[in-house]
Curated annotation (Swiss-Prot):
Gene Ontology molecular function: 3-dehydro-L-gulonate-6-phosphate decarboxylase activity; hexulose-6-phosphate synthase activity; orotidine-5'-phosphate decarboxylase activity
EC number: 4.1.2.43
Coiled coil: none
Gene: rmpA
Function noted in UniProt: Catalyzes the condensation of ribulose 5-phosphate with formaldehyde to form 3-hexulose 6-phosphate.
GO biological process, alphabetically ordered: 'de novo' pyrimidine nucleobase biosynthetic process; formaldehyde assimilation via ribulose monophosphate cycle; L-ascorbic acid catabolic process; one-carbon metabolic process
Signal peptide boundaries: none
Catalytic activities: D-ribulose 5-phosphate + formaldehyde = D-arabino-hex-3-ulose 6-phosphate
Annotated family: Belongs to the HPS/KGPDC family. HPS subfamily.
Induction summary: By methanol or methylamine.
Cited Pfam families: OMPdecase (PF00215)
Name recorded for this polypeptide: 3-hexulose-6-phosphate synthase
Length: 207
């Protein structure tokens, strides 16, 4: 199972600093939507230049103009881009077309989708590299939230998937048992007093 760090910071400088601290422990460096909105596509280029051996994941959350938005992110240096699962099938197919042209990949983010397992199967058929079983920060903040719903959807879907929704060391075994290909950790790393140590601990927890 791969480890992905989600960098939900707001400046290129801060993103590069965090990426530099944790790169040796992670496989995928995700640039969060607020970061890309704050700094533009140049942050993708900067991080890929600093870490050419890592998979750079641009969380574009594209909802329309799939081919165009994916193309500009790939040209900026992204290896993976996200399209929302609630987007029209033609939008996802357009992003996949751009990915094929660049030899890159599209991840379909299932945030806000009620029947994640069914939609996961549909978008995989459209050419998604994998799907992200994702609960956003707002959903995670609700009383009683846990990862079990995401893990169950992943197991049911039987397609390649990642899990994002407050993953931490204690939940890594469950994420791995569910069959996830990627565990996404954001706050567990960037919110830690020592992000490098936190990333190292997450890496060590992956069997």
């Amino acid at each position: 199972m791969k480890l992905q760090v989600a960098i939900d910071l707001l400046s290129t400088e801060a993103a590069l600093e965090l990426a530099g601290k944790v790169a040796e422990y992670v496989d995928i460096i995700e640039l969060g939507t607020p970061l890309i909105e704050a700094e533009g596509l140049s942050v993708i280029t900067a991080v890929k230049k600093a870490h050419p051996d890592k998979i750079v994941f641009a969380d574009m959350k594209t909802m329309d103009a799939g081919e165009l938005e994916a193309d500009i992110a790939f040209k900026a240096g992204a290896d993976l881009v996200t399209v929302l699962g609630s987007a029209d099938d033609s939008t996802i197919a357009g992003a996949v077309k751009a990915a094929q042209a660049h030899n890159k990949g599209v991840v379909v983010d299932l945030i806000g989708i009620e029947d994640k397992a069914t939609r996961a199967q549909e978008v995989r058929a459209l050419g998604a590299k994998f799907v992200e079983m994702h609960a956003g920060l707002d959903e995670q903040a609700k009383p009683g939230f846990d990862l079990n719903g995401l893990l169950a959807a992943g197991e049911k879907a039987r397609v390649p998937f990642s899990v994002a929704g407050g993953v931490k060391v204690a939940t890594i075994p469950a994420v791995q048992k569910a069959g996830a290909e990627v565990a996404v950790a954001g706050g567990a790393i960037y919110g830690a007093a020592d992000p490098a140590a936190a990333a190292k601990e997450l890496r060590a927890a992956i069997a």
